[in-house]
């Protein structure tokens, strides 16, 4: 592991640029659902599959493809990832039916899963151990900046020029990310380690890692019960106009970026303890939103608080999975990171699916407290994991 110095920063920034491109394409559908539904003449909940199937593509693609590409040069793999990303979004921009659009989203999702897994391990590997969460948070800043600017700007572009043009802009960002990776990411990165079936079996049967994957899915996915349908909630429940929603999404994204950086700082030394308290506050905010959503001022404040907490847990979850993998399955750290990325997206898929079911059955307002229940599950399991961590320290 190299020491932290200024030469690490360009590589981290290159990863952040790629994360920005990928983050924009992941979440842009949230703001474009009504436009996609109108253009393809489908229900908005069917258009919502562009979010949930993307998440499923990451869920299944991340561990499988990361394992298959484990012996490749990290830089070569990064460039191939961005090439596939560009191809998938080109297919989406030219899709003539929902079937083609969903297939394009899954292709893009495959690049997402591999990038986020190896990106996290590269970021963690090029800094000292006590700076790992901060390094990962720098990489994930690209993802949060995508939510700050990419999603609201993409929503605005879609409203002005059509949803297809929004995807064309993403293609341009992907090309920039490809060039940035080629120039700034050093060739002399830690080589991938070929993971054996025995290592993978050991990984998927390790109770501590499996527990963390469930925590990730519940804690991260709870917010997406609400977030996937945030645009219609803001319009139909809170009473904001469509043009105002893009501005609110910008504020939501700024809150996410701030929360991500705070989460990285809080998680540097004791990530599991930090996660426990983050999830408690996150659950409370989601429950409160159930009561404040019908009121514009109170609802807006609560939604911004939800944004502050939405990604705050990401650096801690990723650094903790690396810590556990190095302890229990050191030859499969990349695959463990990929499986946690899969868990993030399993949470998104579950959350967005539940959001659609709830919206169709009992109404948008109920997405908040049901999302809160998911996060309560993460609180309970994080508390359990925290107790086991304390026991390990006592036995050491």
Swiss-Prot record:
Disulfide bonds: none annotated. Pfam families: MFS_1 (PF07690). InterPro entries: MFS, MFS_dom, MFS_Efflux_Transporters, MFS_trans_sf. GO terms for molecular function: transmembrane transporter activity. GO terms for cellular component: plasma membrane. It comes from the Bacteria. The chain crosses the membrane at residues 12-32, 48-68, 78-98, 106-126, 138-158, 165-185, 209-229, 242-262, 271-291, 297-317, 338-358, 362-382. It is found in: Cell membrane. Belongs to the major facilitator superfamily. This is Uncharacterized MFS-type transporter YtbD.
């Amino acid at each position: 592991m190299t020491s932290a110095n200024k030469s690490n920063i360009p590589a981290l920034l290159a990863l952040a640029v790629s994360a920005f491109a990928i983050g924009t394409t992941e979440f842009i559908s949230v703001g474009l659902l009504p436009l996609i539904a109108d253009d393809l003449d489908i229900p908005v909940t069917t258009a919502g599959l562009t979010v949930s199937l993307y998440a499923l593509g990451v869920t299944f693609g991340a561990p499988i493809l990361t394992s298959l590409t484990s012996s490749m040069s990290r830089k070569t793999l990064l460039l191939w990832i961005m090439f596939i990303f560009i191809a998938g979004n080109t297919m989406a921009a030219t899709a003539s039916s929902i079937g083609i659009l969903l297939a394009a989203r899954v292709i893009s999702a495959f690049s997402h899963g591999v990038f986020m897994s190896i990106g996290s391990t590269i970021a963690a590997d090029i800094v000292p151990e006590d700076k790992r969460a901060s390094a990962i948070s720098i990489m994930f800043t690209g993802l949060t900046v995508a939510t700050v600017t990419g999603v609201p700007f993409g929503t605005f572009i879609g409203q002005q020029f059509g949803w297809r043009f929004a995807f064309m802009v993403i293609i341009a960002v992907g090309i920039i990310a490809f060039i940035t990776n080629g120039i700034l990411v050093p060739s002399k990165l830690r080589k991938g380690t070929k993971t054996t079936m025995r290592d993978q079996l050991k990984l998927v049967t390790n109770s501590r890692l499996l527990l963390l994957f469930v925590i990730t899915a519940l804690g991260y996915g709870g917010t997406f019960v609400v977030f996937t349908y945030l645009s219609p909630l803001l319009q139909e429940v809170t009473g904001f106009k469509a043009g105002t929603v893009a501005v609110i999404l910008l504020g939501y994204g700024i809150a996410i970026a701030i929360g991500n950086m705070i989460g990285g700082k809080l998680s540097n030394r004791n990530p599991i303890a930090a996660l426990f308290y983050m999830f408690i506050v996150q659950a409370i905010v989601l429950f409160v939103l159930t009561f404040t959503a019908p009121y514009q001022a109170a609802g807006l404040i609560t939604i911004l608080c939800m944004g502050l907490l939405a990604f705050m847990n990401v650096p801690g979850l990723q650094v903790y999975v690396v810590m556990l993998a190095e302890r229990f399955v050191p030859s499969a750290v990349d695959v463990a990171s990929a499986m946690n990325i899969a868990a993030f997206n399993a949470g998104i898929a579950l959350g967005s699916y539940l959001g659609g079911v709830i919206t169709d059955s009992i109404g948008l307002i109920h997405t908040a407290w049901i999302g809160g229940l998911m996060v309560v599950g993460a609180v309970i399991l994080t508390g359990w994991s925290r107790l086991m961590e304390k026991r390990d320290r006592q036995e050491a």
